[in-house]
Amino acid sequence: MRREPHPFSGAIYEAIGDGLVRVDDPAKGKSGVFRYDGTWIEGELTHADPQLLLYVGGPDLPPGRDVYWGFLPPLEDEKTTMPAGGTLRAFENAGSQPPKVVGRYVGDPGVETPEGMRSSSHVPQDFLLENDRKRELLPAVYWKEAPYPGGPAKVPVARYHDKRFHDLEVEHIWKKVWQMVCREDDIPEVGDYHLYEIAHLQYLVVRTGPNEIKAHVNACLHRGRQLRECHGKKATEFRCPYHGWTWNIDGSMRLMTAEWDFPGVREDVSQLAGAKVHTWGGFVFINPDPDAIPFEEYTGPEMLEHYAKIKLQNRYKQADIVKVIRANWKVAMEAFLEGWHTLATHPQMLLAGTEVTDGRYDVFGNWGRLGHLTSGAASPNRGIIPSREQVLESHRATADFNREFLRGLIGEEVEQFTDAELNETSFSNLFPNFSPWGGWGRIVYRFRPSGDNPDECLMHVMLLAPWAEGKPKPPPREQRFLGPDDPWTLAPELGSLAKIFEQDCRNIPEIHVGLKTKQPPYIWYSAYQESVIRAFHDNYARRLGLAEGE
């Protein structure tokens, strides 16, 4: 059973079984019992932090699965090997855990910098880069800064629930942008295909050759019947179950039953309609727009350079989960486009000493880079602000640990990477909905509307484990589907991330409901910490042709 102090009050939250949590607050001399959903049961203490209640008393992982997601063994039958002498190993050997950091809330006053206001824990990124012990190996893009100008800014709430905006998205986004479909490893053999669904649009993405992938609209050219209703393997044709018209996997016509009754029609139905296809980093992308700009132009050079060294195409997909969320896809996605929410949403993470307050936020066209580098165990809202020298010392110690941990996974290839690359876990975003983490972070997010319902979405999470170049990979992990009421802990392959997602998804549906009643009917997004969200909405408004205030 879990037992945690609150990072601000020091009150002890202790699971007592059956989804109940006892909270003892010595400072107030009060205690109470609550359900993990926040419902008060008994006691003088009648209010407690709902997010910590959920973490302590909510759905839990099976024994042995509550492992930090970055240290999960790529394969379930393997064990994680920690570097000898590493910080975590030292605590394990001592039979204890790192001390929990508790401190009174004092607030973060911020600090003025040449680039604008930042958290008072701010350490210039160049300081860490200039003192990198392998500075000569740093990619040039690590030095580039591109904070998004302006802000704070208002965004109308109608964008999140009005069906009109969903319909505009279909026409001006989903029919026009490069969007991730699957991993190449998901369709490894000729004839393997993936059914990609976005709003009411459907595409069959099929491997037609060892180095060729095509995308076809999933509709018979006779009466429109879907050609396939799920993913599949080793297809040699796509035959319509209605009247038997059949196309080869490259989209060319194979058989037209009763052709005698369709004089002059064969030429019009001889090739399935399709979409452009591109592969990058082991991912498969499509763009339905025949006039679409090349993928490399869409992403911009900064994104391609940023990921080049880490070779996402070599990764092994160790987890693949899709969950239905009762919220608009933008509401869900924006919960993962800033780190500031850690303060209230994930209070247990503050017990390690950090708030994720000093990440760098950059915007390069369609690609936003979030949380590029952070300043160690700073917690400015509790007055914990380490010096630059302390930040650098922590940064290097973490890099040393990560280097030795990764050596066990990718061997001597790890020597190609700098301190900054070893520590980076930026949660970046390629417009509109694709977020592969940078550095050696394993997480990939994708958010899509669930059919034509603007009040529901699909949150897709993958974990891509480091994998040695040239080492044979087993088949990728099969996808797990979770319904709207299923807890993330039903996906133990996520490790500790499952508990974190439970907290995020405690907020997301309630945000969506609140936006429908909010007055005034707009959201304020901040100048810096929510700048990538502002950039997203500016891009969104341009593509949809929205007037000011829409």
Features from the language model and the residues they span:
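A short beta-strand micro-motif
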Residues: 2-8
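Short beta-strand micro-motifs enriched in acidic
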Residues: 14-18, 206-208, 448-452
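A short, structured beta-strand/loop element
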Residues: 14-34
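C-terminal catalytic domain of Rieske-type non-heme iron oxygenases
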Residues: 102, 107-118, 122, 212, ...
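Short Pro/Gly-enriched beta-strand edge/turn motifs at strand-loop
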Residues: 175-186, 256-260, 425-431
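Rieske [2Fe-2S] iron-sulfur-binding domain
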Residues: 186-290, 294-306
